[in-house]
C-alpha cells in the first residue's frame, strides 16, 4: 500500500527556504517519474501551499506532513513564530517532520536564546528532523537540544547547464548573490575592492530582505565615496538570474556565519566557482564536492587578495567541466524518500 507524505510549503514563493522546499518536492516527483514513468518511490509525495502559517489549511490526507522551517517564516519574533508553528501542528492533527534551516548560532548575539527556544519547540513535536550539513547537526546539538540526532541531507546542487562562452563584458564586475541582510558580506566585499581599478563594478544580484532596505543605501554610499559603479538588481526571475550569474566576472560569497548555503549552490549550479571564506561548513562542502569553490582565509585582507587574483584570471571562477557537483537533485530525492518513508511507519 502506498503511503502519502504531504510536503506543506509555508511562506511566500520568493523566499529561499520556500524555493528549496519546492525544489525538494519537484526532485521527488521527477525521481518517481523517471525510467519511462515507472514509480521508483513507494511513497506518494504530494505538495500543498500555505502563504502564511495562519492561512486556512487545504484538505490533506497524509500519514506524515513535512515542513521546511525557519523562525522567520513563522513570525516577526521567535516568540510569535513558536506560537504560530505550534498552532499549525495542532491544526494538522497528524505526524509532522521538519527540515530545519538558518539554525541559531552564537553570531546571532542577543537573539540566539529566543531563536533556540523556537527550534527546541519544533524538534520536540517532530516525528523526524533533517538538517543540511554536519555543521548544522553540531549547532542543533550544541545550541538547541543535545538529545536530537537528525538525519543529514546536504542541500542539492541543481543540474549544471553547459558552460556558456559569453563575450567578456567591457567592464569587469564583482558579484554577490542573494538577499541583502546583515552578515551576508555585501559591504565587506565592496570595501575589499578598494585597491581595484575603478572600472571594476560591484553588482548585488538580489533585493534587500524585509526590514533591511537601509543596506542598499549603505552600499550606494560606500560606492559613491569611491566613485565605483554599483548595481542592485532587485528580484530576478530564473532566466534573468541565470544570465546575470554567467555575466559576473568574479562571484563572491563572503558570508561569515554559514551553516549551509543556497546562494553558494546557485553559483555552483550555473558552473561558477565562487570565492568563499574558510570555515566549518565550507570545509565540509569542499570535502564532499571538491573543485566547486575557491577557498580563502576568513579575513578581509584575504578576500581582497582573492578578488584581485580572480580579476587577473577569470577562468579560475568557472568550475572545470570534469567536475560533477554533488549531491544532485536525484541524490537528495532518494535520501528524503528514505527518511520520510521511515517516519510514516
Language-model features: locations:
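Acidic donor-binding loop of glycosyltransferase active sites
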Residues: 243-259, 272
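A conserved mid-protein helix/loop that constitutes part of the nucleotide-sugar donor-binding site
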Residues: 19, 181-195, 265
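Membrane-proximal helix-turn-helix segments that form the acceptor-binding/catalytic region
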Residues: 85-91, 111-128
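Short hydrophobic beta-strand element within catalytic cores of glycosyltransferases
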Residues: 273-278, 283
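Donor nucleotide-sugar binding/catalytic pocket of nucleotide-sugar-dependent glycosyltransferases
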Residues: 124-162
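Nucleotide-activated donor-binding/catalytic signature segment of Leloir-type glycosyltransferases, i.e.
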Residues: 216-242
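Glycosyltransferase donor-sugar binding loop
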Residues: 201-217, 234
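A charged, aromatic-enriched C-terminal amphipathic alpha-helix characteristic of glycosyltransferases
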Residues: 298, 304, 311-344
Amino acid at each position: 500500500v502506498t503511503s502519502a507524505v504531504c510536503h506543506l510549503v509555508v511562506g511566500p514563493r520568493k523566499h529561499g527556504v520556500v524555493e528549496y522546499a519546492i525544489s525538494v518536492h519537484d526532485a521527488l516527483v521527477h525521481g518517481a517519474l523517471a525510467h519511462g514513468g515507472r514509480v521508483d518511490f513507494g511513497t506518494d509525495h504530494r505538495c500543498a501551499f500555505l502563504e502564511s502559517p495562519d492561512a486556512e489549511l487545504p484538505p490533506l490526507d497524509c500519514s506524515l506532513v513535512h515542513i521546511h522551517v525557519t523562525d522567520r517564516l513563522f513570525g516577526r519574533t521567535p516568540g510569535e513564530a513558536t506560537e504560530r508553528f505550534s498552532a499549525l501542528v495542532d491544526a494538522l492533527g497528524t505526524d509532522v517532520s521538519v527540515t530545519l534551516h538558518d539554525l541559531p548560532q552564537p553570531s546571532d548575539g542577543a537573539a540566539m536564546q529566543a531563536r533556540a527556544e523556537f527550534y527546541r519547540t519544533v524538534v520536540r513535536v517532530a516525528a523526524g528532523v533533517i538538517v543540511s550539513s554536519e555543521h548544522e547537526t553540531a549547532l542543533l546539538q550544541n545550541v538547541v537540544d543535545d538529545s536530537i540526532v537528525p538525519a543529514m541531507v546536504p542541500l542539492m546542487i541543481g543540474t549544471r547547464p553547459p558552460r556558456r562562452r559569453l563575450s567578456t563584458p567591457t567592464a569587469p564586475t564583482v558579484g554577490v548573490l542573494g538577499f541583502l541582510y546583515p552578515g551576508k558580506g555585501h559591504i565587506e566585499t565592496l570595501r575589499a575592492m578598494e585597491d581595484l581599478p575603478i572600472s571594476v563594478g560591484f553588482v548585488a544580484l538580489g533585493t534587500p530582505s524585509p526590514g533591511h532596505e537601509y543596506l542598499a543605501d549603505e552600499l550606494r554610499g560606500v560606492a559613491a565615496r569611491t566613485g565605483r559603479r554599483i548595481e542592485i538588481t532587485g528580484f530576478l526571475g530564473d532566466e534573468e538570474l541565470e544570465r546575470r550569474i554567467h555575466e559576473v566576472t568574479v562571484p563572491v560569497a563572503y558570508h561569515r556565519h554559514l551553516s549551509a548555503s543556497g546562494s553558494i549552490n546557485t553559483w555552483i549550479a550555473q558552473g561558477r566557482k565562487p570565492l568563499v571564506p574558510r570555515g566549518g561548513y565550507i570545509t565540509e562542502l569542499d570535502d564532499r564536492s571538491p573543485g566547486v569553490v575557491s577557498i580563502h582565509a576568513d579575513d578581509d585582507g584575504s578576500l581582497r587578495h582573492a578578488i584581485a587574483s580572480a580579476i587577473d584570471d577569470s577562468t579560475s571562477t568557472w568550475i572545470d567541466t570534469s567536475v560533477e557537483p554533488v549531491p544532485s537533485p536525484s541524490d537528495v530525492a532518494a535520501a528524503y524518500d528514505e527518511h520520510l518513508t521511515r517516519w510514516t511507519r
